[in-house]
Amino acid sequence: MPLRPARCYKRIKRPYTRLKYIHGAPYVQIPRFEMGATKAKDRERFTSVAVLRVLEGGQIRVNALEAARQMAYKYLSKVLTDQNFYLKIIKYPHHVIRENKMLAMAGADRLQEGMRLAFGVPTGRAIQIEPGEVLMIVEVEDRNITHAKEALNRARAKLPLPCRIELTRKSVIKG
């Protein structure tokens, strides 16, 4: 079955995170949540921070989050080297997405159950995020803040929710 469009999963219902009860839950497809200069002593010289803040609440599937991470990391590692930035994804995709598969062909009413046993099969994972929460941060030196902003702008294009990029000093980050 192909992947359903993101509009099917954009709205928040309730979190479904208990992996103990979910058999066959898909794994998280994001290999790394921290990239670049990950050691604390290497990050001491970074004074500027670019923050990607979500403006509307909703769900972001792990596919979109991984695409955003790849775009930001690819740009930053090409323009700067890995030791000149720190990229971190703040949120973790705990929510498991289920799908009650429906057949759409002639005679399908004899093959499927309809709404009987409509719990669904786990098909993916997502982040449930509230308005104003931080999704990604990039720490850089002052001279590289335009590159951090461009990286988050490229990542923002891959996300289904509207986002805002904020530029701050390292000591002023909230939430």
Swiss-Prot record:
Q: Which GO terms describe its molecular function?
A: structural constituent of ribosome
Carries keyword Ribonucleoprotein? yes
User: Is Ribonucleoprotein one of the keywords?
Assistant: yes
Record's keyword terms, sorted: Ribonucleoprotein, Ribosomal protein
Q: Which HAMAP family match?
A: Ribosomal_uL16_arch (MF_00448)
The family note in this entry says:
Belongs to the universal ribosomal protein uL16 family.
Q: To which species is this protein native?
A: Caldivirga maquilingensis (strain ATCC 700844 / DSM 13496 / JCM 10307 / IC-167)
Q: What are its GO cellular component terms?
A: ribonucleoprotein complex; ribosome
Q: What is this protein called?
A: Large ribosomal subunit protein uL16
Q: Which GO terms describe its biological process?
A: translation
Q: What Pfam families does its record include?
A: Ribosomal_L16
Secretion signal span: none
